[in-house]
């Protein structure tokens, strides 16, 4: 299946030109769209276990071919050996540029329990990578004009989750961010697509005994409440996460591990 339509392209992300489940013998999906990196079509393909790819590599290869035509590079080739050498060098350059663009476009996203260190570690990663940092809880409070506990008390959890998802959809379709999510972002399945379309998701873990309690937050008011929360959310974190990083030392150590893991993930994706 090859999608050559603009359906699902930024900024109108999250829509698909068709449903892949209607094609039980489908062997592969190629979407020419590269913004976002994973359209709704590609996310469905991944869920169904169907091999798939976006159009970013083709974009770079097309640009390289155009450059050769514009500069008439092939006119200067005097023998087949030179032609092969030029083609091999071109392929290496295409892969390098593709890898650079992929890494620049991909968001590094932290999920995990409240108090696991997502904001602190995320900010350190953003500084190390030279990227903008977005803490979705901070953005929520700024836009709502009140704290999250106050919003919970005034409007309830359902209204909070609605607004949280809207913010996730807005930032998830952008690229090149380090993003720290609220602990409950995994409670709504729709948020997976919002975050995964351009993101590598890191589950930042920390023992419950080390997580802070906050009486003003009903969902994490006590150690018992946190244990119950972790029991419910653990499979959801596992479902969302691409990588798991333990934050059991200093924030700097966790950030260093996260940056290294993210870089490794990008190198693997660019091969």
Regions found by a protein language model. Name each.
Residues 113:
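P-loop (Walker A) phosphate-binding loop of NTP-binding proteins
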Residues 9-29, 40, 44, 187-192:
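Rossmann-fold NAD(P) dinucleotide-binding segment
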Residues 118:
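Conserved lysine of the Walker
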Residues 132, 138-196:
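ATP-dependent small-molecule kinase phosphotransfer cores
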Residues 88, 92-104, 124, 128, ...:
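NTP-dependent small-molecule kinase module
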Residues 197-236, 243:
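A glycine- and Lys/Arg-enriched "phosphate-lid" helix/loop adjacent to the NTP-binding pocket
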Residues 110:
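Hydrophobic anchor at the beta1->P-loop junction of P-loop NTPases
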Residues 27-69:
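Rossmann-fold NAD(P)-binding glycine/threonine-rich loop
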């Amino acid at each position: 299946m090859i999608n050559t339509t603009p359906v699902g392209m930024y900024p109108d992300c999250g829509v698909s030109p068709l449903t892949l489940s209607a094609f039980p013998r489908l062997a592969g999906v190629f979407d020419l769209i590269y913004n976002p990196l994973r359209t709704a079509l590609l996310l469905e393909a991944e869920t169904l276990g169907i091999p798939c790819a976006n159009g970013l590599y083709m974009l770079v290869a097309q640009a390289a071919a155009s450059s050769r035509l514009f500069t008439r590079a092939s006119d200067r080739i005097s023998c087949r050996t030179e032609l092969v050498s030029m083609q091999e060098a071109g392929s290496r350059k295409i892969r390098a540029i593709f890898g650079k663009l992929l890494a620049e476009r991909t968001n590094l996203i932290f999920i995990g329990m409240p108090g696991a260190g997502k904001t602190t570690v995320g900010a350190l990663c953003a500084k190390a990578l030279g990227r903008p940092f977005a803490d979705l809880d901070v953005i929520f409070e700024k836009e709502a004009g009140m704290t999250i506990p106050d919003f919970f008390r005034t409007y309830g959890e359902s209204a909070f989750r609605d607004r949280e998802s809207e913010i996730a959809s807005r930032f998830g379709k952008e690229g090149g961010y380090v993003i720290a999510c609220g602990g409950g972002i995994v409670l709504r399945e729709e948020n997976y697509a919002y975050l995964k379309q351009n993101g590598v998701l890191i589950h930042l873990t920390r023992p419950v005994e080390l997580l802070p309690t906050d009486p003003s937050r009903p969902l994490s008011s006590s150690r018992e409440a946190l244990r119950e929360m972790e029991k419910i959310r653990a499979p959801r974190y596992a479902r969302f996460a691409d990588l798991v990083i333990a934050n059991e030392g200093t924030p700097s150590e966790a950030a260093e591990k996260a940056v290294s893991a993210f870089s490794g993930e990008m190198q693997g994706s660019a091969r």
